[in-house]
């Protein structure tokens, strides 16, 4: 009986640890990408310039807002 209880507790501990690790890593990555977006305003300006568009502040902010809403 003690062996069965030990195996049961080990399995429960592994499941709880895996679940906590998953949600902890998920929260960390959300916070990281919010603080350090994968693309910056300077990169958007350079991209628009390469495509032949004149990068106004309004267009740059629209693109940044669209990207922020997609991350949520």
UniProtKB/Swiss-Prot annotation:
It comes from Lactobacillus acidophilus (strain ATCC 700396 / NCK56 / N2 / NCFM). One of its GO terms (cellular component) is plasma membrane. Belongs to the UPF0154 family. It is found in: Cell membrane. Keywords: Cell membrane, Membrane, Transmembrane, Transmembrane helix. It comes from the Bacteria. Its main location: membrane. Signal peptide: none annotated. Pfam families: UPF0154. It is a single-pass membrane protein. InterPro entries: UPF0154 (IPR005359). The chain crosses the membrane at residues 3-23. This is UPF0154 protein LBA1278.
